[in-house]
């Protein structure tokens, strides 16, 4: 399941705790609790998230308060009903102990070799760009450069030899929790119209509350400047939470723009209601208008842009290179991440059916299937926290031909799915420990590119002769 970025460095160091050496019994107990309750969000392996800042204190009492009460609006659940005071105190001790060991877990201590072997294919990581923070979206320009959107709100033009130029004119974003500047895609006719699309967490103030939502901005790229900016989509309603934005985009073969929107942490009200935009996949014309043949467009009580519903938080989306279908992957809670094909008017079941459980170990539902609700092509137990995905149809990777590659945020590897039609028949984990793998794309040059969070790398997967 996706790590909840709560803005407080408490969550960061929470992540670090899982790989501490058991120096005393209390650490062992706390570590077991971490693995049971925390690792599905915060990751299996220790990570020094250098962009996090302490907001709620570093003393034991302050940490215990954070663990006990959580930050629900930011996606951090409360644990006072699951862990007793002694266990919470031990977990706080583990966090404090982990601070002494942060440096040894930084990116530099990752595997020193940049060559990785798998069944049928060996690749070398070539560094294309670094120090990008959290590179979320990748889009390839006709001249060979790529546009990179980073969660902080910065946009870069990146060349093949680590050249990096900042692009001006991007949207104003709320870079809190899981929000920020997220995906970027080019219009299918970009060479003619220069249109670029950005998904992001838009922000507005209502009284003393700061609210946000998933929004799409279209703009023209002129050199290194964005012009003619227009917001073409805002998911309604805005929410006070800071997680589950979804935000992936893809164009299909007919030129429709598909957009994923998470349920913003309100699974009881949003994903099963077609009266709001949350927990949905939307289909739009390229200028934001609603297609006349969308499934609910004639229902006066429904949101016309909805194409499918019952989603939790889809953070991977692509067009199948052969069939043209839109595929997504989706974060489950504690277990139950999914791979789906988006179908017109379909209900994907969240939270009525689910293969996972809640973070505190309690069941969300006793159903994994129900008539009228879609089943995933595959699901993951435990959660891998899937993000970007890419089909391999390039002759540069004959050993992976036809495979589906998916980035894992939790386990920090590239998941390879061997496909027979729409069926996953085998899986393999690649690039182990490379980092939180946010995105993967196959470029027009036939090479695969991956983005890794913190300190923010983009690598080209260079095939090695075997």
Place the predicted regions along the sequence by residue.
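Acidic, Gly/Ser/Thr-rich repeat motifs that build Ca2+-stabilized beta-propeller blades
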Residues: 87-90, 95-260, 264-267, 316-319, ...
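Sequence/structural segment immediately N-terminal to covalent heme-attachment motifs in c-type
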Residues: 24-44, 61-69, 129
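Extracytoplasmic electron-transfer domains, predominantly the class I c-type cytochrome c fold
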Residues: 40, 48-101, 180-181
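N-terminal export/targeting leaders of redox proteins
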Residues: 1-28, 86, 119-120, 129, ...
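Beta-propeller blade signature
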Residues: 213-223, 274-287, 342-343
């Amino acid at each position: 399941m996706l790590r909840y970025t709560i803005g407080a460095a408490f969550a960061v160091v929470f992540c670090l705790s899982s790989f501490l050496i058991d120096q005393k019994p209390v650490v062992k107990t706390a570590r077991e609790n971490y693995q049971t309750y925390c690792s599905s969000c915060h990751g299996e392996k220790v990570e020094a998230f250098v962009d996090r800042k302490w907001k709620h204190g570093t003393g034991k009492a302050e940490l215990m308060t954070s663990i006990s009460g959580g930050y629900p609006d930011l996606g951090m659940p409360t644990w006072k009903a699951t862990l007793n005071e002694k266990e919470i105190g031990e977990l706080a001790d583990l966090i404090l102990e982990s601070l002494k060991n942060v440096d040894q877990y930084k990116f530099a201590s990752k595997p020193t070799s940049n060559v990785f072997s798998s069944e049928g294919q060996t690749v070398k990581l070539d560094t294309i760009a670094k120090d990008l923070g959290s590179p979320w979206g990748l889009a390839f320009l006709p001249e060979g450069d790529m546009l990179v959107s980073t969660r902080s709100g910065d946009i870069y033009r990146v060349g093949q030899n680590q050249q990096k130029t900042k692009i001006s004119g991007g949207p104003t974003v709320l870079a809190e929790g899981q929000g920020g500047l997220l995906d970027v895609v080019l219009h299918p006719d970009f060479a003619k119209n220069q249109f670029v699309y950005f998904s992001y967490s838009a922000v507005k103030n209502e009284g003393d509350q700061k609210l946000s939502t998933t929004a799409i901005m279209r703009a023209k790229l002129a050199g290194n400047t964005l012009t003619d900016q227009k917001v073409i989509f805002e998911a309604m309603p805005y929410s006070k939470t800071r997680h589950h934005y979804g935000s992936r985009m893809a164009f299909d073969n007919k030129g429709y723009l598909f957009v994923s929107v998470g349920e913003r942490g309100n699974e009881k009200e949003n994903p099963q209601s077609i009266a709001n935009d949350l927990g949905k996949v939307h289909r739009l014309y390229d200028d934001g208008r609603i297609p006349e043949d969308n499934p609910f467009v004639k229902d006066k009580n429904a949101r016309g842009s909805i194409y499918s519903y019952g989603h939790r938080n889809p953070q991977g989306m692509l067009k199948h290179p052969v069939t043209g279908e839109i595929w997504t992957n989706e974060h489950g809670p504690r277990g139950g991440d999914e791979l789906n094909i988006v179908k017109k008017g379909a209900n994907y079941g969240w939270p009525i059916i689910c293969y996972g459980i809640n973070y505190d170990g309690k069941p969300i539902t006793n159903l994994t299937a129900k008539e009228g609700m879609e089943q995933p092509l595959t699901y993951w137990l435990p959660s891998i926290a899937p993000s970007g995905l890419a089909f391999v149809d390039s002759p540069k990777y004959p050993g992976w031909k036809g495979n589906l590659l998916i980035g894992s945020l939790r386990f920090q590897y590239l998941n390879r799915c061997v496909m027979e039609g729409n069926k996953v028949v085998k899986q393999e984990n690649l690039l182990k420990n490379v980092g939180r793998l946010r995105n993967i794309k196959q470029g027009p040059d036939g090479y695969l590119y991956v983005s890794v969070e913190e300190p923010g790398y983009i690598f080209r997967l260079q095939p090695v002769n075997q």
